Structures are given as C-alpha cells and as structure tokens.
Amino acid sequence: DVYKRQPQAMAAPTPVSAYLHSATMVKAGVFLLARLWPALAGTEQWFWLVGGAGLATLLVGGYAAMFQNDLKGLLAYSTISHLGLITLLLGLNSPLAAVAAVFHIMNHATFKASLFMAVGIVDHESGTRDIRRLSGLRTMMPITATLAMVASAAMAGVPLLNGFLSKEMFFAETVY
C-alpha cells in the first residue's frame, strides 16, 4: 500500500514535498527501527524480518522507479528504494551498518531535497514534470541542470560526493 500512497503524496507543492518527503515524514518508520535496533538487533528474527523487508523494498522501489514518467514520481519511488536500503542496513547485526544507516538518512535528506527543489524549478519554468516532454533543459537552465546533476550523482554514489561513503559502507557490510 505504501508503494501507491508514497508517490501520490509527492504531488504536494515543491517546498512541502521537499521537506516532508526528504527529511521528515518518510523517515518516521526508519527512525523507529533505529530506536529498536539496540534492543532487538542480533536475533535471527530481526535479521530475516527487517533485512528481508529492506531488501524487498529496495528492489521493488528501484524497479518501479524505472517506469515513471513524472519527475516527482521517479523521486518518490527512488525514496522508497533508499528507505529499503536503510532498512536493510538496520537489519544487519553490525554497529557499522547502523552508523551507515544513520549516515545515509542524512545524505538522503540532503540530495533528495535538492532534487525536489530542482524538479520544482523545472516544473515552474517548463510547465511540466513529464520526462517525455522535457528536453534541452541543460541549455535553457544551465545552473539548475548542473545542481540537479550533482545531486543525482550524489544519490547514485559517485565518489567524492556525500552518497558515496554511505553506499560504500553499505557494500562493505553486505558483501563481507
């Protein structure tokens, strides 16, 4: 059900969606898991329930994001995927994974708020958020395009940007 409600909630005005959906509202459940982590982590049930739910959310959110034509819908489903990544980290029995989860929460809030604001600028200037109708924005809005590319690169985990370290911590904890 969250897979349907989350993207619909992104239709709010840009500053509202940037604040609510990058920093506060969507992080409430993850915050609860982080608060329960010291008491419940380390059990096999915690690993399978929380880690499994996180992995499923990570994959389903990423898959659904690939089919979005609305920029805010794309950001909504990528948020679902990132929340799955954070939940998966909290499902692991490792102090470094918990640190990586908290670090990624902060990184996610930073780059996702930037992307929401960029989408708001694009929507205001072009009158649409439909990816199929948008082209040539780099020449029409070079500053916005540059900032959106930097925020997107951070979200992708490009080295030297804030998303890289938390995703590197994710890989270090899940691969080894």
Regions from the PLM with identified roles:
Residues D1-Y176:
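Hydrophobic transmembrane alpha-helices and their helix-loop junctions in integral membrane proteins
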